[in-house]
Amino acid sequence: VVQLNFEIDDQTPEDLSVALEKIRELPGVLDVNQSLAFGKKGRMMFAVQILVVSQAESDVMAQCFEETTTLGIRKIELDRAILNRSEHIVNVGTEKFRTKRASRPGDMTTKVEIDDIAHLPGIRRRSTKADIENQTSEE
């Protein structure tokens, strides 16, 4: 995995948002993060961090130069540890919810896909989420 880093202080937030969404959709991109930072002369800027599989590094860097105003990109090769994960469908009444289970040392955790419960009203959303996650973690 390669981490690409750069800062932006001369591109509007709206335009950068569009640019990063396009980058996020590229094959091989694992994650895109942006945060606010302070740069030279006390200027506010966006610090951008992109995780990409090694094989896609060149294409993603080219797209970063195309879509953003950055003049340079730092890259770092990373090793990473990944938990075993699996996806499952849980039925609750007539509704189906996607879940992701992770095998942690000595434990199994489950998270409901937020898009599947987002349509539920507040209290029901939270209780449905808790019920599914508690039920499936015990299996």
Role assignments for model-derived ranges:
Residues 2-45, 49-139:
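Long, contiguous binding/interaction regions
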